[in-house]
Design a protein with these regions (language model features):
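Long, compositionally biased tandem-repeat segments
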Residues: 1-297
């Protein structure tokens, strides 16, 4: 409806087809419609974009990407209007990236969180998470989505969204998938791309944990590197560095994986703390050494 009704949801995609976009909200408290989910197929369909909000409505969530041979990305969240938040990004299908979070409204809207990446297949790596940016003067950036896990090591998490130009805090980086690296936190709000006076930096993403070794033979995977914290403003704190991922355990014969190093703290009026290192994986029950623990910067 033109005054209060929410936008309609997008339709479900046909086999291997993309989901439809959610309808836009028009006025008052209208929220945007949710994007349709992608159809299941050999390369799963993309999720539809969430509808944009009306006057006070929240942006619609992006549709989820379908699971398929390669997967597809989740739809982007819709944009908030005046003081409303952006919609969340859709989940990635297997092997697909998460959708980006929608941008916050013009005055105070927070950015939507990025959707998580889908799990990787036997050979695929997981997708990256998306990120949303804060709108207006003090909208906070959305958090980056987590990276998907995978047999060959997960991909990194999404970067945190940037805070709005005056007071917004940066969003936190998403955690890495198994064996992957987390992405860095977003910048605190700043005018023309510079850190604002009161915007804190987003925390860095944690590194993903290493996968265990094979049942009989095989070394554990190494933990992912934690990412650096985002930059804070002169009157604010830099983001904390992400934790290093733990090394994977060997099972019977093999060495444990090394732990990932922690990320550096972000700069700012007060620097953020560095992230702790991950623990080393255990060696095999019959033969094998314990992995080396990661260090904090």
């Amino acid at each position: 409806g033109w005054l209060y009704g929410n936008g309609g949801a997008g339709g479900q995609g046909a086999t291997a087809g993309a989901g439809g976009a959610g309808a836009n909200g028009v006025s008052s408290t209208n929220g945007g419609g949710t994007g349709g989910n992608g159809g299941i197929g050999g390369t799963g369909g993309a999720g539809g974009a969430g509808g944009n909000a009306g006057l006070l409505g929240v942006g619609g969530a992006g549709g989820h990407g379908a699971s398929g041979g390669a997967g597809d990305r989740g739809g982007a969240g819709g944009t908030g209007f005046i003081s409303s938040d952006g919609g969340a990004g859709g989940d990635g299908g297997d092997g697909g990236n998460g959708g980006a979070g929608g941008t916050g409204g013009l005055l105070f809207g927070a950015g939507g969180n990025g959707g998580p990446g889908g799990s990787g297949g036997a050979a695929d790596i997981g997708g990256n998470g998306g990120a949303g940016n804060g709108g207006g003067t003090d909208g906070n950036g959305g958090n980056g989505g987590s990276g998907g896990g995978a047999g060959s090591g997960g991909d990194g998490g999404g970067a945190g969204g940037n805070g709005a130009w005056l007071f917004g805090n940066g969003g936190a980086g998403g955690g890495g998938g198994k064996g992957g690296n987390g992405a860095g936190g977003g910048l605190g709000g700043g005018s023309f791309g510079l850190p604002g006076l009161n915007g804190s930096g987003g925390d860095g993403g944690d590194g993903g944990n290493g996968a265990p070794g094979g049942v009989l033979y095989g070394n554990g995977g190494a933990g992912g590197q934690g990412s650096s914290g985002g930059i804070g403003g002169p009157g604010a704190t830099g983001g904390a560095g992400g934790k290093g991922g733990d090394g994977g355990d060997a099972q019977l014969i093999g060495d444990g994986g090394n732990g990932g190093n922690g990320g550096a703290g972000g700069t700012g009026g007060t620097p953020g703390p560095g992230g702790p290192g991950g623990s080393g994986g255990l060696g095999g029950l019959l033969f094998g050494q314990t992995g080396t623990a990661g260090v904090s910067p």
